[in-house]
Curated annotation (Swiss-Prot):
GO terms for biological process, alphabetical: nervous system development; phospholipid dephosphorylation; phospholipid metabolic process; signal transduction
Keyword Cytoplasm in annotation: no
Protein name per the record: Phospholipid phosphatase-related protein type 1
Family designation: Belongs to the PA-phosphatase related phosphoesterase family.
Glycosylation sites recorded in the entry for this protein: 5, 163, 316
Keywords: Cell membrane, Cell projection, Glycoprotein, Membrane, Phosphoprotein, Transmembrane, Transmembrane helix
Xref: InterPro entries: P_Acid_Pase_2/haloperoxi_sf, P_Acid_Pase_2/haloperoxidase, PA_PP_rel
Domain of life per record: Eukaryota
Length: 325
């Protein structure tokens, strides 16, 4: 029910947010936790060839020894788009030229009799909430792919340490399905079976593309033509270099990184285009009046002027009719 031109009353927005949105978000976070921190989902044991050169790369060490550690990656992934959204929304709300268009797209929601949700708060919660949901959803997709495929990392044979003197490894072209042939550290071997798709590549491109879509859709700069392209391309380049780092350190195959890029891109495009509608307001742009159909416009009536030829023709026709009768 509308209250004013820029205010709309809604009794369902708060219950929907608490009992629907937060429940879905909590379930997504819980599922991501089970994939990351528990052994609920067992990794598929994939076979290998004992003399496979693609799996004999040197062991690069634990993830904490990588050039891009998981802690740094997750902090940057979460903080960068969130900071961009906060800065962008606050700037647009307090700049007069952009505030008018923002208020035209978003109405202030009145919940109950006293609580107002202004457009600034609604947009920040919407965009950051969707981003967080997509981040956990991407993590779930990646973990599910790694668990189902059990694709081996480039350094798998280095940490597996198979018994090359056994009968199974004597033949160069014999495929080994027995996972018990490995003699290395079981925990390291378990992580070496989770290569496809690359988690670093998927999460980094998702975060970078989501931030890029927000910048290009909402931030308007009339004085500079290169500020937005430099910021967007720099963000995407960082994600691209993150994937290349995984290949250079022999932690993932090229195909793993490409699959991660495709997965993260798909999630970001879906959420950005279909869920937040290119970061536009829920009211949309004000509708323009439709032009009148020219066929429906009444014509101006003019007095009829009878020509002399028509008068003479009518007289001749009446005379001929009289003769016939």
């Amino acid at each position: 029910m509308a209250v004013g031109n820029n205010t709309q009353r809604s009794y369902s927005i708060i219950p929907c947010f608490i009992f629907v949105e937060l429940v879905i978000m909590a379930g997504t976070v819980l599922l991501a936790y089970y994939f990351e921190c528990t052994d609920t989902f067992q990794v598929h044991i994939q076979g290998f060839f004992c003399q496979d050169g693609d799996l004999m790369k040197p062991y690069p060490g634990t993830e904490e020894e990588s050039f891009i550690t998981p802690l740094v990656l997750y902090c940057v992934l979460a903080a960068t788009p969130t900071a961009i959204i906060f800065i962008g929304e606050i700037s647009m709300y307090f700049i007069k030229s952009t505030r008018e268009s923002l208020i035209a797209q978003e109405k202030t929601i009145l919940t109950g009799e006293c609580c107002y949700l202004n457009p600034l708060l609604r947009r920040i919660i919407r965009f950051t909430g969707v981003f967080a949901f997509g981040l956990f959803a991407t993590d779930i997709f990646v973990n599910a792919g790694q668990v189902v495929t059990g694709h081996l990392t480039p350094y798998f044979l280095t940490v597996c340490k198979p018994n090359y003197t056994s009968a199974d490894c004597q033949a160069h072209h014999q495929f080994i399905n027995n996972g018990n042939i490995c003699t290395g550290d079981l925990e390291v071997i378990e992580k070496a079976r989770r290569s496809f798709p690359s988690k670093h590549a998927a999460l980094s491109i998702y975060s970078a593309l989501y931030a890029t879509m927000y910048i290009t859709s909402t931030i308007k700069t009339k004085s500079s033509r290169l500020a937005k392209p430099v910021l967007c391309l720099g963000t995407l380049c960082t994600a691209f270099l993150t994937g290349l780092n995984r290949v250079s350190e022999y932690r993932n195959h090229c195909s793993d990184v490409i699959a991660g890029f495709i997965l993260g891109t798909a999630v970001a495009l879906f959420l950005g285009m279909c869920v937040v509608h290119n970061f536009k307001g829920t009211q949309g742009s004000p509708s323009k009046p439709k032009p009148e159909d020219p066929r429906g416009v009444p014509l101006m009536a003019f007095p009829r002027i009878e020509s002399p030829l028509e008068t003479l023709s009518a007289q001749n026709h009446s005379a001929s009719m009289t003769e016939v009768t």
